[in-house]
Amino acid sequence: MDTFQVIILALIQGLTEFLPISSSAHLILPAQLLGWEDQGLSFDVAVNTGSLLAVVMYFRREILSMFTAWTGSVVSRKQTDESKLAWWIILATIPAVIIGFSAKDFIETHFRSIEVIAATTIIFGLLLWWADKMQRQGLNEFQVGWKKALVIGIAQAMALIPGTSRSGATITAALMLGLSREAAARFSFLMSVPVSLGAAILVTKDLLSSGQVIDYQALGLGILVSFIAAYICIHYFLKIISKMGMTPFVIYRLALGAVLCWIIFL
């Protein structure tokens, strides 16, 4: 890939990974409109690593606090709000791990098409709108509980279907379960850490076993661009939803779905 292609795709990944608008729906557009070839495993590793580093850096204090409390709870068996939150995030990760290992190839074979991405972009956009309009209890992330965490984890597993959006599915579920917009987003972002880390490890393993030639310059640029874009995106997303809710992202998803449908019927 040339430098321009690396920057554009890394920007798309970084800006869409944590917004409820589906990164896969956006990454398919350059391929369809510009005829770009698949970026390959090494680039996937790079942009996913950049996004992961961004969320870890942004929530570094919360993550350190949770990790410290969680390790303390394992030793002393005394639970704090932070240790409970850590346990709930671990629990919420399990469905995605199970379905990811058991159905990844099936999903990649049968659901990775522009038709599926267009449909899920629209359907889950409407679900996000409905969830955002529901009357909520205004719960924060420390009030999730194990049952709600498991339901949100199942929603995260559903996001393995391209076009769904991991953040979109988890935020939608969290809103339906009574969390405030900000708490739903924070819980979704924190949930992304173990899943993204696991995915990065698996893709790296596939990369090393594939014998693919690695362009380290493109990889480094992809990490840097996706990190900066994702960090900025997280910061402003939390500000936007506190003032405007999810409506801008719902409208955007519906418009994007319409564009994908237009491409399908061209």
UniProtKB/Swiss-Prot annotation:
<comment type="similarity">
    <text>Belongs to the UppP family.</text>
</comment>
<feature type="transmembrane region" description="Helical">
    <location>
        <begin position="183"/>
        <end position="203"/>
    </location>
</feature>
<feature type="transmembrane region" description="Helical">
    <location>
        <begin position="246"/>
        <end position="266"/>
    </location>
</feature>
<protein>
    <recommendedName>
        <fullName>Undecaprenyl-diphosphatase</fullName>
        <ecNumber>3.6.1.27</ecNumber>
    </recommendedName>
</protein>
<feature type="transmembrane region" description="Helical">
    <location>
        <begin position="39"/>
        <end position="59"/>
    </location>
</feature>
<keyword id="KW-0997">Cell inner membrane</keyword>
<dbReference type="InterPro" id="IPR003824">
    <property type="entry name" value="UppP"/>
</dbReference>
<feature type="transmembrane region" description="Helical">
    <location>
        <begin position="218"/>
        <end position="238"/>
    </location>
</feature>
<dbReference type="GO" id="GO:0005886">
    <property type="term" value="C:plasma membrane"/>
</dbReference>
<dbReference type="GO" id="GO:0008360">
    <property type="term" value="P:regulation of cell shape"/>
</dbReference>
<dbReference type="GO" id="GO:0071555">
    <property type="term" value="P:cell wall organization"/>
</dbReference>
<keyword id="KW-0961">Cell wall biogenesis/degradation</keyword>
<feature type="transmembrane region" description="Helical">
    <location>
        <begin position="144"/>
        <end position="164"/>
    </location>
</feature>
<keyword id="KW-0133">Cell shape</keyword>
<comment type="function">
    <text>Catalyzes the dephosphorylation of undecaprenyl diphosphate (UPP). Confers resistance to bacitracin.</text>
</comment>
<feature type="transmembrane region" description="Helical">
    <location>
        <begin position="111"/>
        <end position="131"/>
    </location>
</feature>
<dbReference type="GO" id="GO:0050380">
    <property type="term" value="F:undecaprenyl-diphosphatase activity"/>
</dbReference>
<keyword id="KW-0812">Transmembrane</keyword>
<dbReference type="GO" id="GO:0046677">
    <property type="term" value="P:response to antibiotic"/>
</dbReference>
<keyword id="KW-0573">Peptidoglycan synthesis</keyword>
<keyword id="KW-0472">Membrane</keyword>
<feature type="transmembrane region" description="Helical">
    <location>
        <begin position="87"/>
        <end position="107"/>
    </location>
</feature>
<keyword id="KW-0046">Antibiotic resistance</keyword>
<keyword id="KW-0378">Hydrolase</keyword>
<dbReference type="Pfam" id="PF02673">
    <property type="entry name" value="BacA"/>
</dbReference>
<feature type="transmembrane region" description="Helical">
    <location>
        <begin position="1"/>
        <end position="21"/>
    </location>
</feature>
<dbReference type="GO" id="GO:0009252">
    <property type="term" value="P:peptidoglycan biosynthetic process"/>
</dbReference>
<keyword id="KW-1133">Transmembrane helix</keyword>
<keyword id="KW-1003">Cell membrane</keyword>
